[in-house]
Amino acid sequence: MRLTPELLVECYRRGLFPMAGPGGRVGLYRSDPRAVLELDALHVSKSLARVLRKGVYEVRIDQDFEAVIRACADREETWISEEIIRAFLGLHRRGLAHSVEAYDGEGRLAGGLYGVALGGAFFGESMFSRRPDASKVCLVRLVERLRERGYVLLDCQVQSPHLERMGAVEIPEAEFMRRLSEALRLDRAFA
């Protein structure tokens, strides 16, 4: 299987997401239960609220998508292969994959996240942080943007302690697929 932007779109519409295993071989996966972040249930800790109020980071959208996806892939164990990066860069060029980036006071990329926007759904793929709270700031700004633009679903795929602290919950796959179907009928613009 060769991962293309077109295949990625079809996968997301069917509730699948790509991951590369050892050696970079890409597979398509589902998660049951599925982690989602309800847009009205984001948990912002007091310390994160202070960081947001102080404006420690400048947040930008789609300023350097490739730097974000490569930073997300830059770990000892990663599921983001070169093939996945190429396919997502193609999606980004088509206006379907987006990044939210946090820059420090020196203008350096301090953290970010990326994902795919289809209809009224946003599929969060990965995030990274080089400085304290940078990826969390990006997640807060992402949720604000999705709310403002009328999105109804933020897919986090697989629950993690970090996402759980931010308010992500797990739902049965059948419920996720029902909600995904409803979200895909909407016409929303991320950019």
From Swiss-Prot:
Primary location? cytoplasm
* UniProt keyword list: Acyltransferase, Cytoplasm, Transferase
The UniProt entry, under InterPro entries, shows: Acyl_CoA_acyltransferase, Leu/Phe-tRNA_Trfase, Leu/Phe-tRNA_Trfase_C
Q: Does the keyword Hydrolase apply?
A: no
What Gene Ontology terms describe where this protein resides (cellular component)? Answer: cytoplasm
One Pfam family from the UniProt entry?
Leu_Phe_trans
**What's an example Gene Ontology biological process for this entry?**
protein catabolic process
Q: Which Gene3D superfamilies match?
A: Leucyl/phenylalanyl-tRNA-protein transferase, C-terminal domain
Q: Which GO terms describe its molecular function?
A: leucyl-tRNA--protein transferase activity
Q: What class of enzyme is it?
A: transferase
Reaction(s) catalysed by this chain, per the record, are: N-terminal L-lysyl-[protein] + L-leucyl-tRNA(Leu) = N-terminal L-leucyl-L-lysyl-[protein] + tRNA(Leu) + H(+); N-terminal L-arginyl-[protein] + L-leucyl-tRNA(Leu) = N-terminal L-leucyl-L-arginyl-[protein] + tRNA(Leu) + H(+); L-phenylalanyl-tRNA(Phe) + an N-terminal L-alpha-aminoacyl-[protein] = an N-terminal L-phenylalanyl-L-alpha-aminoacyl-[protein] + tRNA(Phe)
Is the Transferase keyword given for this protein?
yes
Location(s) in or outside the cell: Cytoplasm
Give its E.C. classification number.
Answer: 2.3.2.6
Report the sequence similarity comment from the record: Belongs to the L/F-transferase family.
Q: Which HAMAP family match?
A: Leu_Phe_trans
The role this protein plays is: Functions in the N-end rule pathway of protein degradation where it conjugates Leu, Phe and, less efficiently, Met from aminoacyl-tRNAs to the N-termini of proteins containing an N-terminal arginine or lysine.
Q: What is this protein called?
A: Leucyl/phenylalanyl-tRNA--protein transferase
Species per Swiss-Prot/TrEMBL record:
Rubrobacter xylanophilus (strain DSM 9941 / JCM 11954 / NBRC 16129 / PRD-1)
Taxonomy of origin reads: Bacteria, Bacillati, Actinomycetota, Rubrobacteria, Rubrobacterales
